[in-house]
Amino acid sequence: MSETQQQVQNSTGSIRSPDKIEDTFRRMKVNEDNMEQSSPYPDRPGERDCQFFLRTGQCGYGNSCRYNHPLTNLPQGIIYYRDQLPERVGQPDCETGACKYGPTCKYHHPKDRNGAGPVLFNVLGLPMRQGEKPCPYYMQTGLCRFGVACKFHHPHPHSQPSNGHSAYAMSSFPSVGFPYASGMTMVSLPPATYGAIPRPQVPQSQAYMPYMVAPSQGLLPPQGWATYMTASNPIYNMKTQLDSSSSASVAVTVTSHHHSFSERAECRFFMNTGTCKYGDDCKYSHPKERLLQSPPTLLNPIVLPARPGQPACGNFKAYGFCKFGANCKFDHSMLLNPYNNTGLAMSSLPTPYPYAPPVSTNLRISSPPSPSDMTTLSNGKPAAAEAQSLETEKQDDSPTEPEKSEVEDSLPPNGSDSTSLPNDKPDAETEKQDDDSAELDSSKVQDSSDKST
């Protein structure tokens, strides 16, 4: 018996029912060129059935799987086609339209939807499903956590209604019906959404940004132009308003708009500071009334937080700066206008480093006059005594030579500036002065005796 006949006999012997024969023909596919195509999974009638194949219709091991992969024992309604999505009759339809699970998806994929036109995506990469209801989370936040697997409709951001709730609020730019006298048309831009960067809150009276465009220039905002505005410096905005007030071509007024959710609780951080680091992602309410409570002139040169109800910051009041910056919980308000036409008085600003002249701590205590000074005054020499007193006062007033004054005060007051020699021998002038003083004393004693007699 040849080997071919033996293989045929073995194969026919392994077939136990007509269903196996039908199964074999079903697993054998013929293409347009009448070329036989082998089955993607092996048929092993004598082995146990692959449980994963029976449950999902595919096998991760492919031809190397050692178990049997019968098509007749598949659950009712499951029809597996290679390179196609599975059809599972009785299961809910897979509504993604771009199934990333492929043959392992447990939902039904009807033929009329398989191979249909591709799913359209918006500018954010989210699916647009015409006929389905809009995704509520996307309409509120501008994001979708399910991505391409979401079964709801995600329209383009510019087609959403601008209700202030979406982070990507965009709308068209209708022009006002009446033109200006100079032939220019006003275009009202929608309000900007709440920014995530903290900045000083300056309340504005207008809710929209007027922007005048000449028809001859043709400068119209493009469709879908984002209205999100970054954080701006209020001092720069005021300067821009002053500079643009003299121009008749363009008038720009920068405003800010804060969305609020009446059905949600108020943001405590926003109510205390006027800013919120989460921006549009914050789930709490940011009421507009909070912006109207702060006075419009609470500005300082380095844009520190102004907290009217809190005590004044000691560092800012004394030195003009605060090391804590925007995190300081005290008040840093200055009631002044940095762009006042009358000019800014420098005396109104706090001195960064106050300077006080140094005070001398060396105190001079003068000694009482000695009897020799009184004797000199009584002997008819007031000029020498007066000169000595003036010289002593000058020495007391001069702080640069304290040691010299102390040496002079330690000498005996004899009406002269001479000092004794190191060998303690008086010179001729000193001896002469001593003789004169002795004569004066003797004459004084004689005069007193004459008066007594």
From Swiss-Prot:
Top-rank lineage group of the source organism: Eukaryota
InterPro entries: Plant_ZF_CCCH, Znf_CCCH, Znf_CCCH_sf
Ranges of biased composition (kind: Basic and acidic residues): 17-32, 391-407, 441-453
Gene3D superfamilies for this protein: 2.30.30.1190, Zinc finger, CCCH-type (4.10.1000.10)
Annotated spans, Disordered: 1-47, 360-453
Modified positions (N-acetylserine) in chain numbering: S2
Chain ranges of zinc fingers (C3H1-type): 44-72, 95-112, 129-157, 261-289, 307-335
GO molecular function annotation: DNA binding; mRNA binding; zinc ion binding
This protein's UniProt keywords: Acetylation, DNA-binding, Metal-binding, Nucleus, Repeat, Zinc, Zinc-finger
Keyword Metal-binding recorded: yes
Cellular compartment(s): Nucleus
Cited SUPFAM superfamilies: CCCH zinc finger
Name of the protein this chain belongs to: Zinc finger CCCH domain-containing protein 26
